[in-house]
């Protein structure tokens, strides 16, 4: 398409320089319109990808325990969360459709104005004997050959922006640094005691774990009981070193968790799922 545009512009310039210069001067108007629309599509696609990821995460965490959720008092709360997530995706997709519905008419309007301006200028040149009618006819034929490639290029630009917006999170994940599995200390003793001191965890401005302090001794079995979403799995993930976004201190036989590398700490734990 780009090659077709360049070749057509060369032929148009050969036929008439004045009309071609006018056409080239009006192309930036098209670019000015396309760039904001492309950026809007990028933002909308990024929001759509994020909303879909949240919905997938929600379902993957809830469907495995759906029977338990149905028997809890939080069932209606989960229904509201589910509806909110679905409604969010619907609103984002609706916004995307609205943007696309405006894109094509705006493109056609700009092209129509350009063609009308070229015809008007061509008529003026013919009236003043600065251009022959045959040249004008040939110019119009080549002009219509350039329209479809320009439309295809603009559509390609918006699709590229949509793709960038959709894959934005994936690109950010790929840029995240890998875990450095180094050894800080050698701990060969059997664990006798774990101390949890003033542990807090917040997610999305919501306090999940609030100032928990525990002493866990060897040889005892501890049950963590609570309603769905109260932070049971989060606490286990923190203790196993799978979640580091918390405040507070965790000690293993008086040794602070920070003295261990992630690799060493995780080797001290066995995580057995309910399944």
Swiss-Prot record:
It is found in: Cell membrane. It is a multi-pass membrane protein. The chain crosses the membrane at residues 21-41, 106-126, 137-157. Keywords: Cell membrane, Membrane, Plasmid, Transmembrane, Transmembrane helix. GO terms for molecular function: ABC-type oligopeptide transporter activity; ATP binding; ATP hydrolysis activity. InterPro entries: ABC1_TM_dom, ABC1_TM_sf, ABC_transporter-like_ATP-bd, P-loop_NTPase, Type_1_exporter. One of its GO terms (cellular component) is plasma membrane. Its main location: membrane. Residues 1-162 form the ABC transmembrane type-1 domain. PANTHER family: ATP-BINDING CASSETTE SUB-FAMILY B MEMBER 10, MITOCHONDRIAL, ATP-DEPENDENT PERMEASE MDL1, MITOCHONDRIAL. This is Uncharacterized protein in epiA 5'region. It comes from Staphylococcus epidermidis.
């Amino acid at each position: 398409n780009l090659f077709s545009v360049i070749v057509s512009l060369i032929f148009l310039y050969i036929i008439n320089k004045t009309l071609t210069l006018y056409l080239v001067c009006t192309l930036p108007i098209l670019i000015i319109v396309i760039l904001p629309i492309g950026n809007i599509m990028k933002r909308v696609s990024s929001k759509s990808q994020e909303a879909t990821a949240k919905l997938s995460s929600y379902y993957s965490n809830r469907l495995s325990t759906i029977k338990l959720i149905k028997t809890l008092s939080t069932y209606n709360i989960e229904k509201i969360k589910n509806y909110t997530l679905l409604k969010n995706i619907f609103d984002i997709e609706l916004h995307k459709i609205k943007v696309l519905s405006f894109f094509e008419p705006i493109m056609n309007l700009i092209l129509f104005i350009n063609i009308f301006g070229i015809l008007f200028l061509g008529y003026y040149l013919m009236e003043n004997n600065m251009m022959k009618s045959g040249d004008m006819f040939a110019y119009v034929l080549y002009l219509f050959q350039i329209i479809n490639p320009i439309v295809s290029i603009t559509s390609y630009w918006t699709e590229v922006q949509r793709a960038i917006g959709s894959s934005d999170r994936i690109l950010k994940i790929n840029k995240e640094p890998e875990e450095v599995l180094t050894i800080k200390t050698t701990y060969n003793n059997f664990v006798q005691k774990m101390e949890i001191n003033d542990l807090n965890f917040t997610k999305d401005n919501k306090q999940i774990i609030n100032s928990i302090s525990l002493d866990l001794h060897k040889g005892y079995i501890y049950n963590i009981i609570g309603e769905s979403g109260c932070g049971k799995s989060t606490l286990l993930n923190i203790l196993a070193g799978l979640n580091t976004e918390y405040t507070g201190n965790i000690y293993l036989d008086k040794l602070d968790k920070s003295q261990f590398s992630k690799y060493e700490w995780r080797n001290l734990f066995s995580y057995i799922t309910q399944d």
